[in-house]
Amino acid sequence: MRKILKLKIGRDELVFETGFMAKQANGSVLATYGGSSVLATVCCSNNVREDLDFVPLSVEYNEKYYAAGKIPGGFIKREGKPKDKEILVSRLIDRPMRPLFDKRFGREIQVIPTTLATDQLNPPDIVGMNAAFTAVFLSDIPFNGPIAAVRMVYLNGKFIVNPSFEEIHDSDLDIVVAGSLNGITMVEGGANEVSEDILLSAIDGAHEYIKQICNAQKEFLDIVGEKEKLPLAFEEKIFEFKEELKDFIYTDLKEACFVKGKLNRDKAITLLRNKSYEHFSSLEKLTDSNESLFYKAFDDFEREIVRNSILNDKIRTDGRTPNEIRDIIAEVDILSRTHGSALFTRGETQALAVTTLGTSIDEQIMDDIDGDKRLNFMLHYNFPPFSVGETGRLMTGRREIGHGHLAQRALESMVPGKNDFPYTIRVVSEILESNGSSSMATVCAGSMSLMSAGVPVKRQVAGIAMGLISEGDKYVVLSDILGEEDHLGDMDFKVAGTKNGITGFQMDIKIENVTKHLMRDALEQARIGRMHILSVMDTVISDSRVGISKYAPKIVQLQIDIDKISLVIGSTGKTVKAITDEFEVKVQIEQNGKIILFGDDDFKMQKAKERIESIVREPKVGEIYEGIVKKINSFGAFIELTPTKEGFLSTRLKSRDNKYGSGRFGTGNRYPRFGGGDNIRGNVGLVRPPKLEEGQQIKVKIIDIDKFGKIDLEVVRDKDY
């Protein structure tokens, strides 16, 4: 039976509906905000696995073109593989939900939010998040909900919840926040150098709306009726010889956990793990049924040692204090033929960023249900297996897309717009080593690479990843976390920004929620760390280079009247093609009359610009042109002034008192001009004309333009005849 619940959030009502679509799923909810609707379903497998120590959750957000009344572009007229946007929204849904599933459930869980309609005013991603959270909460799958999400922007000094696309575009802060009744579970967004106080205020305001949606979900559950929850697949089992294992390894494991260097530390821990495995195998205390419990017990002891050292002694596995940042080495211009390059090394994490400048032809065209877009700034993040000393496939996965998007958001508010810098900009980050915080190393390397390439960025940007170790009310915030601190800790909070404020951030937690006080501490510690990193980067490069690389394409711009565009293009593109071929340039003509020339030769580009200016220039009486004789007849000669303009050189000799003499044109004859000089047969003011042939260049002057635009010319002479 169809059930409906409505609540007002911001400018529109958020509507939840269930019981009439996709009823065979474990849970299904249709959520609508304004004119945007998303159907979310959740299903679980019937196969139970007791050997899982993680939640086998997959989220597949997808958008249908029919939702916007569109048909997919390209040859294949159906939706294909997930676009980057769909992957990013899937991650937004996955990350706050994952910690709230019970690992003991032991079944594969799949959540599929599908955008069925969009009004192109309200972004469907937030609608999809709430549809998915509500579908799981109403289902029979064990889930520690409810949770909800909203988007907040900061625009003209005010916070707006669930803004329109236009408000997002114009805002100084765009943040997506997910949370429960008790606190925040996920934060992600970008900003234009906002302060920590503004960010915290946005999160605070978002949580108030989140609590309203969570309470509405509980009310909806009462209306629909709570389903009997599926049983957990297994109870938490403990390795029966755990205390013996502790006695055997604990002292040695304490030493191994604090060996200097990631590879050496991993090697020491692995040797001890193998040694203890062989020991318990020899005692016949390991079987197929408890082998996984043995490894879990070993990992639990490692986790306990590392966390206790940080909480109680404030010492991390590499010997640093909680707020200490690893040694930083920064370099620029390390690749000779690229347009810009930088290498950023922080401890055992290293990112090589390379900037390439292209033309508007290189822009990325996005065929999207929210409207087609053209991106002239892109950042691509690559994480090859050798960066962690492993073998594997070279491929772009969801993690690479997510990390690249975060780094791009951190940098894009500092990148100039098309009007100020009409290049397409692509930054590629190659992670050469990784031991934590590679996405923030990408931000640092990318910022320096842009400056190296001569991109006039507003300010330098740096990023840092913060961690958390907590036990009850006791907690320690960590600066510049290692990979193992991310794995064993409770939070991964990435913050990027300039000296003036924050430009990008992302927070994920593994505990139920974090408090405002804890977030304030983390942001302040991140700010201090960011200032330190920026100071190191500024010693290498602090401002963008003046001028771009000699290997980058050159650009010349000019503005013409809109009604002159057709003159530049010419019949069937003849004129613009001639310019392209003659001067070896690419010509981009925009609808507003802006013309951009791309090429490699400055001289040829300047000549191409002059040619276009001459084409669109309105002729005036008294102007002098280097014309070409196009046609000669008995009445005169037609002179091409520009590819789109001709003037007429009359056959009759004109004197200074505007009286005409006699004479006829013909190839090889001499023709008249007005302007004095030698006399012919004693007639004052009549001059001996030059000899002309078709195709010949001749210097002429405009002497008259009638109301119909007809141009009369006279010959300009450099010397007397």
UniProtKB/Swiss-Prot annotation:
The record's annotation in Gene3D superfamilies points to:
GHMP Kinase, N-terminal domain, K Homology domain, type 1, Nucleic acid-binding proteins
Residues recorded as binding Mg(2+), renumbered to this chain, are: 486, 492
Cellular location(s):
Cytoplasm
Q: Kindly provide the name given to this protein in its UniProt entry.
A: Polyribonucleotide nucleotidyltransferase
List, alphabetically, the HAMAP family matched: PNPase
In this chain the S1 motif domain maps to: 622-716
Family, per entry: Belongs to the polyribonucleotide nucleotidyltransferase family.
| Cofactors (names) | Mg(2+)
Residues in domain KH? 553-612
**What GO terms fall under cellular component here?**
cytosol
Q: Describe its function.
A: Involved in mRNA degradation. Catalyzes the phosphorolysis of single-stranded polyribonucleotides processively in the 3'- to 5'-direction.
Keywords noted in UniProt: Cytoplasm, Magnesium, Metal-binding, Nucleotidyltransferase, RNA-binding, Transferase
User: SUPFAM superfamilies from the entry?
Assistant: Eukaryotic type KH-domain (KH-domain type I), Nucleic acid-binding proteins, Ribonuclease PH domain 2-like, Ribosomal protein S5 domain 2-like
Q: Which reaction does it catalyse?
A: RNA(n+1) + phosphate = RNA(n) + a ribonucleoside 5'-diphosphate
The biological process GO terms on file are:
mRNA catabolic process; RNA processing
What EC number(s) would the UniProt record show? 2.7.7.8
GO MF annotation, one: magnesium ion binding
